[in-house]
């Protein structure tokens, strides 16, 4: 059994990317895995201020909902991100969370598998490429992990 965290980054109620996140979570549960589905909707996530205190102390000085999410990511075997595509890129809230998880960088982490679920109004093959590239930049900082899959649902 693996520990799976699915992070839905859309703030819109009933969003397409949240629907994908729910289905991924249901599939993982049906396969016998322990799943935590986290929606950023309603969460307080402030911007990184670039102070780098986290690199010295191992903790971010900003008080909001990020530390709890980060702890779940650190302890997960699988991380799945779900995001709408805005201007051919991941959502701003996803990027903000990734930036804030800078405190994870020097820590031990369990995740080896990362998945990406994306949705967009446009349906062309190139639409999700920059979002994937942005996430791959984060994954590259965690050498034991890799992008195992990306599902794009366009035209929605």
Where are these regions (language model features)?
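A short small-residue
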Residues: 2-5, 78, 115-116, 151-156
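Short secondary-structure transition/capping segments
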Residues: 79-92, 126-135, 154-156
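Cofactor-binding loop segments of dinucleotide-utilizing enzymes, especially the Rossmann-like FAD-
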Residues: 9, 40, 118-121, 153
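Short beta-strand elements in bilobed, periplasmic/extracellular small-molecule ligand-binding domains
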Residues: 34-38, 144-154
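N-terminal beta1-alpha1-beta2 submodule of the flavodoxin-like/Rossmannoid cofactor-binding fold
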Residues: 1-104
């Amino acid at each position: 059994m693996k520990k799976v965290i699915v992070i839905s980054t859309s703030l819109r109620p009933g969003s397409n990317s949240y629907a994908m996140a729910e289905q991924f979570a249901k599939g993982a549960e049906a396969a016998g895995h322990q799943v935590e589905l986290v929606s950023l909707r309603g969460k307080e996530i402030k911007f990184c201020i670039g102070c780098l205190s986290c690199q010295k102390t191992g903790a971010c000085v900003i008080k909001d909902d990020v530390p709890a999410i980060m702890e779940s990511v650190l302890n997960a075997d699988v991380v799945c991100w779900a995001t709408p595509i805005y201007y051919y890129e991941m959502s701003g809230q996803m990027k903000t969370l990734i930036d804030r998880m800078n405190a994870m960088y020097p820590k031990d982490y369990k995740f080896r598998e990362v998945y990406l679920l994306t949705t967009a109004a446009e349906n062309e093959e190139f639409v999700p490429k920059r979002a994937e590239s942005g996430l791959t930049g984060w994954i590259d900082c965690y050498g034991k992990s890799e992008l195992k899959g990306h599902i794009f649902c366009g035209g929605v």
